[in-house]
A protein has these predicted regions:
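Catalytic core of PPM/PP2C metal-dependent serine/threonine phosphatase domains
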Residues: 24-42, 46-47, 51-53, 59, ...
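Helix-loop-beta hinge of the Bergerat
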Residues: 43-44, 58, 146-151, 260-294, ...
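Conserved beta-strand-loop-beta-strand hairpin that lines the nucleotide-binding pocket
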Residues: 68-73, 86, 133, 259-261, ...
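Conserved beta-strand-loop-short alpha-helix elements that form
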Residues: 71-84, 144-147, 180-202, 254
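Conserved ATP-binding N-box helix of the HATPase_c
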Residues: 105, 292-320, 471
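C-terminal catalytic subdomain
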Residues: 184-185, 190, 197-280, 286-296, ...
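Flexible, glycine-/charge-rich segments associated with ATP-binding catalytic modules
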Residues: 233-272, 364-421, 431-435, 443
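Amphipathic alpha-helical interaction surfaces in cytosolic regulatory modules
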Residues: 300, 306, 428-507
């Protein structure tokens, strides 16, 4: 399938349909994100990505799941300021750096440090946020590090809790620590972006409470098996059903569970062997949760190999041992490995035009086929790397469009020509408001040469673009040995966001 067709196929249509440049940007977004999440023996992974309709452009949310050589799993979610091609390109670069660091054995804190160094030389990555988790599925050990990103939510049998401590975004000079925790079987970890918290009309702190409540409720309704994908779908539907959403929303969930068993079969060299193998494999693949296309491909390939063994392995050894052995397992790194062994003699395909077609089909259906030919018998080994597709969605039918804010953005000084005057900011500081706020701050601080105070107590939304502007203004002031005082009382929208990203505000106004 051509790459563009594949990426367009990952886009789940909006309620109104997307066409033209917006569709092209969405296709770009799909091309820069992973096509799916791995299927693993001890941890179920699910993801959802909901594209924003406000700004009608591809955004900077991103995620990744990296299976490491020792079977550990790296989980990453990040958010780049802004929308459009620049944001998508930046998140693609950050994703590549994070993946390389994880595959090279980097710890979560090490990955954050590498991203921070990279972001210093890439303007569009300044104040990007990211959370990195490494999970050992065997022991349940968790390591977490974050740069200005909302903390991951761990759901356990005793209740929910958020992990880690807040620190500043990338390229802001913040120190990034690493926390440790542990997951038991059945526990579920959720990484996400702020789009699920900062829904229209919802205070960010309330958004965090809503997420914990919804996630706890939905986890209790899971039917006992691993259901990370359904969990993501249900959390998204429950939280945006009544409020709608403004920004991209990304969810990445991992649920630890008991290991998936193997399939071991010893079959007679009769046609019933094929039927028995297919039935056992069908049950195992259903427990694995692969999609229908993958299940069909694996079933077909195994059926062809078992048929070959039954029909040809023992034709010149009548009366001897005539058993076909089938072994199926999912490795710690997410590879389905199947071995079909017999004690007969390998017979290369004849010149007959229809001989050897079964093996040829098997080679085309799975990732890798190897044949071990020994005097004691033949073993055919099949390997296939399944994953669970992740759909990039626009607004699902029935979801309300984010309403326009009742209060417009406004920023004004309390008095003109007064160095003690405070810049008071009202309303939502979204991407458009951030541009105006940048101009205001440059003007009143003389590009950082005059100390000023900014009252953010009346802000109803402080988007990542606004955080970027505030960091820029703070750094300009610091460079000139001046101060930019950010005023936000505890409990306010701005206080919640500023604490999260490491721009600790003054609480007394």
């Amino acid at each position: 399938m051509p790459a563009r067709d594949r990426d367009e196929g990952r886009l789940h249509g909006s309620a109104d349909g997307a066409h033209g440049p917006d569709q092209d940007l969405a296709v770009l977004q799909a091309a820069l994100l992973p096509a799916g999440v791995p299927i693993l023996p001890r941890v179920a992974v699910g993801a959802r990505y909901l594209l924003a309709e406000v700004d009608t452009a591809a955004g900077g949310d991103w995620y990744d799941t990296v299976v490491l050589s020792d079977g550990s799993v790296g989980l990453v979610v990040g958010d780049v300021v802004g929308h459009g091609i620049a944001a998508s390109a930046t998140m693609g670069q950050l994703r590549a750096v994070a993946r390389h660091c994880l595959e090279s054995g980097g710890s979560p804190a090490g990955v954050i440090a590498a991203l921070d160094r990279f972001a210093r030389d890439l303007d569009d990555a300044h104040t990007a946020t990211v959370c990195v988790v490494v999970l050992d599925p065997t022991t349940g050990a968790l390591r977490v590090s974050s740069a200005g990103h909302p903390p991951p939510l761990l759901l356990t049998a005793t209740g929910p809790r958020y992990l880690g401590r807040p620190a500043g975004p990338l390229a802001t000079g913040a120190a990034h620590a690493q926390a440790e925790d542990r997951m038991a079987d059945g526990d579920l970890l959720l990484l996400y972006t702020d789009g699920i918290l900062e829904r229209p009309g919802v205070h960010p702190a309330q958004g965090g409470d809503d997420l914990a409540d919804a996630a706890t409720h939905l986890r209790e309704r899971l039917d006992g098996g691993p259901a990370a994908q359904r969990f993501c779908d249900d959390v998204l539907a429950l939280l945006i059903r009544s409020t709608g959403y403004r920004d991209d929303v990304t969810l990445l969930a991992a649920q630890r569970h008991a290991p998936l068993g193997t399939v071991e079969l010893s079959l007679p060299d009769t046609p019933v062997a094929v039927t028995t193998a297919r039935a056992a494999l069908d049950t195992w693949l259903a427990a694995l949760g692969v999609d229908d296309l993958t299940a069909t491909a694996i079933q077909h390939a195994v059926g062809e190999v078992v048929t070959n063994a039954v029909e040809h392995a023992y034709v010149d050894r009548p009366g001897g041992p005539s058993t076909v052995h089938v072994h199926v397992e999912l490795t710690e790194t997410g590879v389905v490995e199947i071995a079909v062994a017999d004690h007969g003699r390998w017979r290369p395909p004849s010149d007959h035009p229809y001989r050897g077609m079964g093996l040829t089909m098997a080679v085309d259906l799975v990732d890798d086929v190897r044949i071990d030919r020994l005097p004691s018998g033949t073993t055919v080994r099949l390997r296939h790397h399944p994953n669970r597709a992740v759909t990039l969605s626009t607004r699902p039918a029935g979801t309300p469009i984010a309403p326009m804010p009742d209060e417009p953005f406004l920023a004004a000084l309390t008095a003109d020509d007064d160095l003690d005057a405070v810049l008071v900011v009202h309303g939502p500081v979204d991407a458009a408001g951030a541009v105006e706020l940048r101009d205001q701050l440059r003007s009143i601080t003389g590009n950082g040469t005059v100390s000023r105070s900014v009252d953010l107590s009346r802000v109803t939304l402080l988007a990542s673009a606004a955080v970027h502007v505030l960091y820029e203004a703070r750094d300009r002031s610091t460079a000139h040995r001046e101060r930019l005082h950010l005023l936000a009382p505890r409990g306010s929208t701005a206080h919640h966001v500023l604490e999260l990203v490491g721009l600790h505000p003054l609480e007394q106004i």
